[in-house]
């Protein structure tokens, strides 16, 4: 047998294959090829895949072999075989040449063996070489990118140092990293691998340095970032003044003068806390045994009129308990045997006093008292009657204010004692009630931080924050304690977000009112069965939950299951529903603070911040999903959105729903501003920052739309004073958005909303309209009187600034075409012209008016140098007969240190100046604690002796140790210029 036929390919066959390869340019023996070198003309015309054979597979299938034609192409030149055939050399792409040498030389011997070698070794070499080539190209590209990034990083660090630390010596040239050009010069003689490694390490070091520079001012965020008050910080005011250019000083001067005015308003109230009257043995006996008026009917009617309107109080302390306390108090005077009389604890006295103060504060405020006294039929309270209104009508406003001032001094006396040594659960309860009263005053609520802190510490001492301490208690006592702890938890986080203070409670150490604790309570409630609807602790809602929740299974959240159960039905009149929803909101708000604002929160990576914020937003929206339909928070552009004016139901129900919605949108507004307040190296490249900004602004717009048409006369003074914070905060957020980006299309819409809100909701109140009425200038001691005027003044001043910024940047006229708006803004300057004066000139007048710092004390006990309390106030106070046994209450009239010619008592405070008729009414207001008839002048030596801390403020422009001094250290409220819009 011919060995050639068995050992190799037949010569004729080989010649045909060679001819086909020359004709088509394709190797017919290479069956693994993915691409062909030449396709036939028919396949090329039809743009279909050709197998490259002759005739090709497509033409054979179409039975059109005669038309299968390959256009002539130059035949590839045969490569000359090298001497070292067994050695394969790599081309520039790392592909072995051995295969091509053997193929194109026509040597078909051992083709199968050659293919196996390629399969075994050639492909592996190809993959390895190709990977090395790609890595080399990537390294070259990264080297070029690093050069650009290093230049960017260097410029960024230089700008950060120039802006934030221009006066600091801690950054010098020796501490900075080498410049990019120096790095590349040093690495010019290195290998490519060494250069890449060095550049990468250098880039990491520079990014780290940039991050450290960004974090150097994170102390600014310790206070104020999660609050809205930082808009009045020094940095914020300087930024606004710079934005206004040549108009900056004119428009910012009245805002800079406001702290001086606030100090004059706060001084009488501060004096009550830091320098209370001295109490002797007789006065102490009166405070412990007979601190209330002799008229028991007045007390009863005050409770009738206002107790039912304050749903928060009704949750904390049951009305029957309060009435029993006052009944026992007045029964003591009918008991002839002293040993049988009930001795009240200081905590009980503080509780009773706080309730009366809350009621009186509603009566003594001008914008709330008239309608509620003269039109009792409009009230929904079952206890409100015409007889009650007539009884209160016998007590004019001056007498009620005198009583309020007396009870306020008594409450501070009780607080100073029980804040040192607690009397147990009653102390926590009384302090919470006192917090409600102090919180109702916008100007003085900063005192609450200390009271809240003391209250929480006392609550933790008796274990209210740990669920295991409730195991051996009966259901009624355990429910009461959980309710008290809820108030502690609520006020802690509420005050934190309003004032910018850090919360006191560590949530990791709290188990009360957790999901496990709620499940335990529900299990106990199911054993009791239906309970009386009159018992607020065991409402029908609680019974519905106990009978339905345990039948559900597989849920991730017990709280959401509870909301599902009580989603329908008449539940909004039940205080438990508001309490429970506020608990869930407080949880999310607490998590927000601990995830975003604490020092240990991660701030270097914007992505992690965004992920955290998205989770918090999702929690808020999930909560809203399961709320009752009427209470469900909806944005202003939702078709189902309704304002307060369109709400139905009782005033309590309307206020409860409004409170839930305001809290919800306020929290969304604040936390979604946080990414705008920080600077990270990657925040400008993440489009989520725009989404957060839009969510914050939408929430602010929704708040202003919610209160549209809300008449303050329709709400109780307690609720209005608490809720007024939310529209003011939303107003300022939109102000900041417009000033930052006045040329955005949305800025015009936002400005129209601000103007409309100012002309409607923040319109002239009764106090504003009567501030120029000279015959109404009379002494009163309540600090609440000027609160509404201060808010309206702030709103008008900020609107004045934002309109000017918008006009300058858009070349439009807003005020010229709106006479009503002109009058609205002009009223502020007409009524309070002094705050528009030069800061130094206004300061000199304030020195002559305000006098000594309240922290300095009287340098002399000379009656001629002491400010005198209005005699009419003391006279009215004595006529009230506050004590059944002592008609002249010297303590509540303030301890007098001298007397005038008529023998009337006089009160010595820290040195105060005379009444100045040339100053505007915001200074000579009835709430300033001064009267022309009773004030005397202060000499210059006395002023220099006592004008310590306040004098420092006037000279150094920093309110050292004053309540508003923190504003100077708050961050810039307007820092959202990293948006790239």
Swiss-Prot record:
Disruption phenotype: Impairs increased CDR1 and CDR2 up-regulation after fluphenazine exposure. Increases susceptibility to fluphenazine, fluconazole, and terbinafine. Does not affect susceptibility to flucytosine or caspofungin, two antifungal agents that are not considered to be substrates of CDR1 and CDR2.
Alphabetic keyword roster: DNA-binding, Metal-binding, Nucleus, Transcription, Transcription regulation
A Pfam entry, by short name: Zn_clus
GO molecular function, one term: zinc ion binding
Regulation: Drugs such as farnesol and 1-dodecanol are able to hyperactivate TAC1 probably via phosphorylation by the Mediator complex.
GO biological process, any: cellular response to oxidative stress
Role played: Transcriptional activator of drug-responsive genes including the ABC-type transporters CDR1 and CDR2, as well as HSP12 and RTA3. Binds the cis-acting regulatory drug-responsive elements (DREs) with the consensus sequence 5'-CGGAWATCGGATATTTTTTT-3' in the promoters of target genes.
UniProt protein name: Transcription factor TAC1
Organism: Candida albicans (strain SC5314 / ATCC MYA-2876)
Gene: TAC1
């Amino acid at each position: 047998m011919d060995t050639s036929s068995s050992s190799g390919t037949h010569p004729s066959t080989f010649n045909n294959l060679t001819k086909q390869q020359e004709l088509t340019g394709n190797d017919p023996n290479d069956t693994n090829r993915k691409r062909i070198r030449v396709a036939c003309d028919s396949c090329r015309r039809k743009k279909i895949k050709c197998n490259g054979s002759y005739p090709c597979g497509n033409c054979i299938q179409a039975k059109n072999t005669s038309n299968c034609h390959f256009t002539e192409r130059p035949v590839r030149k045969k490569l000359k075989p090298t001497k070292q055939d067994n050695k394969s050399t790599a081309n520039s792409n790392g592909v072995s040449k051995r295969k091509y040498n053997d193929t194109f030389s026509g040597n078909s011997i051992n083709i199968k063996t050659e293919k196996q070698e390629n399969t075994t070794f050639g492909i592996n070499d190809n993959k390895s070489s190709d990977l090395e080539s790609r890595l080399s190209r990537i390294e070259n590209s990264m080297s070029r990118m690093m050069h650009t990034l290093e230049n960017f990083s260097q410029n960024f660090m230089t700008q950060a140092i120039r802006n934030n630390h221009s006066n600091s010596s801690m950054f010098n040239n020796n501490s900075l990293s080498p410049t990019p050009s120096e790095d590349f010069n040093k690495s010019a003689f290195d290998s490519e691998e060494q250069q890449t490694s060095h550049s990468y390490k250098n880039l990491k070091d520079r990014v780290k340095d940039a991050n450290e520079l960004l974090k150097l001012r994170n102390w600014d965020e310790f206070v104020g970032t999660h609050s809205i008050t930082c808009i009045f910080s020094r940095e914020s005011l300087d930024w606004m003044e710079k934005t206004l250019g040549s108009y900056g000083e004119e428009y910012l001067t009245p805002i800079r003068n406001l702290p001086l005015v606030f100090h004059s308003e706060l001084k009488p109230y501060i004096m009550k806390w830091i320098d209370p009257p001295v109490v002797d043995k007789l006065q102490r006996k009166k405070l412990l045994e007979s601190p209330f008026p002799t008229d028991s009917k007045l007390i009863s009617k005050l409770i009738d009129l206002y107790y039912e309107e304050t749903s928060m109080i009704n949750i904390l302390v049951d009305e029957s308990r309060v009435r029993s306390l006052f009944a026992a108090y007045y029964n003591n005077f009918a008991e002839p045997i002293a040993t049988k009389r009930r001795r009240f604890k200081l905590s009980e006295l503080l509780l009773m006093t706080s309730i009366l103060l809350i009621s009186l504060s509603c009566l003594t405020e001008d914008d709330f008292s008239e309608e509620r006294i003269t039109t009792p039929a409009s009230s929904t309270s079952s206890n409100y009657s015409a007889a009650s209104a007539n009884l209160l009508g016998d007590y004019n406003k001056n007498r009620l204010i005198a009583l309020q001032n007396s009870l306020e001094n008594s409450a501070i006396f009780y607080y100073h004692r029980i804040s040192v040594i607690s009397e147990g659960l009653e102390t926590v309860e009384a302090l919470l009630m006192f917090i409600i009263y102090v919180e109702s005053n916008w100007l003085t609520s900063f005192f609450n931080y200390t009271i809240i802190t003391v209250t929480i510490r006392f609550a933790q001492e008796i274990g209210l924050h740990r669920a295991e301490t409730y195991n051996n208690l009966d259901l009624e006592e355990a429910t009461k304690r959980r309710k008290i702890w809820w108030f502690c938890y609520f006020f802690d986080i509420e005050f934190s977000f309003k004032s910018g203070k850090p919360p006191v409670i560590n949530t990791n150490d709290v188990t009360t009112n957790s999901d496990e604790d709620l499940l335990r309570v529900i299990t106990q409630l199911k054993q009791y069965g239906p309970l009386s609807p009159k018992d607020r602790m065991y409402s029908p809602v609680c019974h519905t939950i106990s009978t339905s929740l345990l039948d559900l299974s597989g849920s991730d959240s017990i709280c959401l299951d509870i909301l599902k159960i009580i989603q329908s039905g008449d539940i909004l009149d039940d205080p438990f529903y508001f309490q429970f929803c506020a608990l869930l909101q407080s949880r999310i708000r607490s998590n927000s603070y601990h995830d975003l604002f604490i020092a240990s929160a991660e701030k270097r990576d914007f992505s992690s911040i965004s992920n955290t914020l998205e989770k918090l937003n999702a929690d808020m929206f999930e909560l809203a999903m399961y709320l009752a339909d009427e209470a469900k928070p909806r944005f202003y552009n939702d078709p189902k959105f309704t304002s307060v004016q369109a709400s139905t139901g009782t005033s309590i129900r309307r206020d409860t729903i409004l409170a839930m919605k305001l809290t919800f949108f306020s929290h969304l507004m604040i936390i979604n501003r946080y990414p705008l307040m920080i600077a990270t190296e990657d925040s400008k490249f993440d489009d989520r920052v725009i989404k957060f900004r839009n969510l914050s602004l939408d929430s602010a717009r929704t708040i202003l739309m919610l209160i549209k048409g809300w008449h303050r006369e329709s709400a109780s003074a307690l609720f209005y004073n608490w809720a007024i914070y939310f529209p003011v905060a939303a107003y300022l957020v939109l102000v900041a958005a417009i000033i930052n980006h006045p040329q955005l299309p949305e800025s015009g819409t936002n400005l129209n909303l601000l103007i409309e809100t100012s002309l409607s909701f923040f319109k002239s109140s009764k106090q504003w309209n009567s501030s120029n009425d000279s015959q109404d200038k009379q002494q009163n001691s309540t600090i609440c009187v000027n609160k509404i005027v201060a808010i309206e003044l702030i709103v008008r001043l900020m609107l004045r600034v934002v309109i000017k910024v918008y006009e300058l940047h858009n070349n439009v006229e807003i005020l010229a075409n709106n006479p009503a708006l002109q009058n609205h803004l002009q009223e502020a300057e007409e009524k309070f012209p002094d705050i528009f004066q030069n800061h130094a000139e206004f300061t000199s007048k304030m020195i002559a008016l305000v006098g000594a710092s309240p922290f300095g004390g009287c340098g002399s006990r000379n009656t001629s140098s002491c400010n005198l309390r209005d005699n009419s106030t003391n006279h009215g106070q004595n006529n009230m007969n506050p004590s059944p046994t002592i008609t002249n209450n010297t303590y509540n009239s303030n301890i007098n240190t001298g007397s005038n010619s008529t023998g009337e008592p006089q009160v010595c405070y820290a040195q105060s100046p005379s009444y100045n008729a040339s100053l505007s009414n915001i200074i000579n207001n009835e709430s300033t604690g001064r009267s022309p008839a009773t004030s005397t002048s202060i000499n210059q030596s006395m002023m220099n002796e006592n004008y310590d801390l306040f004098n420092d403020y006037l000279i150094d422009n920093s309110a050292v140790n004053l309540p508003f001094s923190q504003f100077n250290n708050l961050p810039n409220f307007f820092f959202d210029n990293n948006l790239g819009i």
